[in-house]
Amino acid sequence: MSEIIYISLNDLLIRYPELTDTIKGQYLLLLSELTYTSYIETSMFLKNVEKISEFGCIIVGIINNSSSFEIVASGTIIIEPKIIREGRNVGHIEDIVVSKEMRGKGISQKILDKLKSIAREKNCYKVILDCDDDVKKVYMKNGFNVKGFQMAEYFD
């Protein structure tokens, strides 16, 4: 197996600006293995990646071959400043996904480790995430504990 490189999506776009549409396409295809995705204009995609970079980071795992690369995994962390806990931060981990072909190879652990490292660098006192019941064991193996319940109200 080729080596997987872990890099922020923002840095990947900066490094390969001529491949923006390819990167966007691969990233959305990967996310579609996690949830519903719809078409997004390239300008909006770039704007949102930049916005997320202001408050956190999207990490992608790529297989880099000599002439091309493939995005095979991703995870996002958003940093929330808090008034409690001496003003320290909370890291919100979102959108963890590994392509079906690459699951079971420890890639999600590496993505989570990278995101937790960012959380420590950003003075977070904890990281939290929501997940479906059928994958909670993956997160428990990576140091997470079940706490409370997720609640949501969708507007669309």
What residue ranges belong to the model's regions?
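Conserved acetyl-CoA binding element of GNAT-fold acetyltransferases
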Residues: 87-100, 149-153
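Short amphipathic alpha-helix that is part of the acyltransferase structural core
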Residues: 2-43
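Conserved beta-strand in the GNAT
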Residues: 61, 69-79, 97
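A short helix-loop-beta-strand connector motif used in the catalytic cores of GNAT acetyltransferases and
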Residues: 49-61, 92
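Conserved acetyl-CoA-binding loop-helix of GNAT-fold acetyltransferases
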Residues: 98, 104-117, 141
